[in-house]
């Protein structure tokens, strides 16, 4: 693990323990609502294998009320932001919160690719080698609901977009795709619909060749950061530079989080996105947030979904 940029806090022995951080943050999140649960998390001796019951308890404690839910989220985020650190190239460490006002290490310029394709004016979904649209898509949604494949609310959301194809291009909006090269990200679909997208990803040549090729074949506009001949930016080490670049983009901003990395690096980059969000929200009053949920988390299942499944 490279000790540069957003890093885990070091313990008394100098080690940056992911387990110690996870245990402490979950305990801090539970403490205002479920002190007993907080104590159980703190006493967990094998966090790497035993964290699941404590994450389940986070959800259970939040179900009681909206206030409890928000209190847990606020306490957990505050704990994470208070504990995580930022390591500079000189070895000095500062608080994560200092990134809100920290100067950028470099200034990022903006390059642009305008797609050559015709924008799609109708929502379609890939299915068994084809694309479902129109009545065929609506019938398939009904079948999926009847067979318990999707929840009724998910099908209704798709039907709403089908009924409003003018939404697809998101006029007047710039969608920031953090993790532009992510396979599960929306970059390809947005560009196919004719939207304006700002893509952020690591400065890797092959990655950007693929992203730029997608943009050329699409029907939208891709904005991306450059510095000289370098394309892209590393969120873990460049939150101020990326935030300054995003602050100057046109249109209403949707900040979409689709970043992913293996192991501890995923926590570091996700925390960097949090810091970026705080800084950007302080600089602009028109920022909306979007993210991709994970099926590996713990969720409270709504009553209509339970009723539909039995």
Task: Mark where each language-model region is.
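Low-complexity, highly charged intrinsically disordered N-terminal segments
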Residues: 39-154
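Conserved acidic E/D residue at the C-terminus of a beta-strand in Rossmann-like folds
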Residues: 199-204
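Long, charge-rich C-terminal accessory regions
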Residues: 265-268, 272-310
């Amino acid at each position: 693990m490279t000790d540069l940029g957003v890093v885990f806090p070091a313990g008394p022995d100098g080690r940056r323990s992911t387990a110690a951080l996870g245990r402490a943050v979950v305990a801090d999140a539970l403490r205002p609502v479920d002190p007993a649960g907080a104590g159980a998390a703190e006493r967990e001796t094998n966090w790497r294998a035993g964290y699941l019951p404590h994450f389940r308890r986070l959800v259970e404690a939040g179900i009681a009320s909206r206030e409890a839910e928000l209190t847990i989220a606020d306490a957990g985020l505050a704990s994470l932001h208070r504990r995580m650190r930022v390591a500079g190239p000189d070895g000095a460490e500062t608080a994560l919160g200092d990134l809100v006002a920290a100067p950028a290490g470099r200034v990022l310029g903006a390059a642009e690719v305008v797609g050559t394709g015709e924008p799609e004016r109708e929502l379609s979904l890939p299915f068994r080698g084809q694309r479902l649209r129109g009545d065929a898509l609506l019938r398939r949604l009904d079948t999926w609901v009847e067979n318990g494949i999707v929840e009724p609310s998910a099908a209704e959301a798709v039907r709403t977009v089908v009924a409003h194809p003018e939404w697809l291009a998101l006029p007047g909006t710039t969608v920031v795709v953090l993790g532009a090269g992510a396979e599960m990200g929306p970059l390809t679909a947005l560009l196919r619909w004719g939207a304006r997208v700002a893509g952020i990803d690591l400065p890797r040549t092959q990655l950007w060749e693929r992203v730029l090729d997608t943009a050329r074949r699409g029907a939208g506009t891709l904005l991306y950061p450059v510095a000289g001949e370098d394309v892209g930016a590393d969120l873990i080490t460049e939150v101020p530079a990326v935030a300054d670049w995003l602050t100057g983009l046109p249109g209403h901003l949707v900040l979409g989080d689709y970043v992913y990395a293996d192991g501890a690096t995923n926590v570091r980059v996700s925390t960097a996105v949090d810091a970026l969000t705080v800084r950007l929200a302080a600089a602009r009053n028109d920022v909306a947030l979007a993210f991709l949920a994970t099926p590996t988390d713990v969720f409270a299942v709504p009553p209509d979904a339970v009723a539909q499944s039995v």
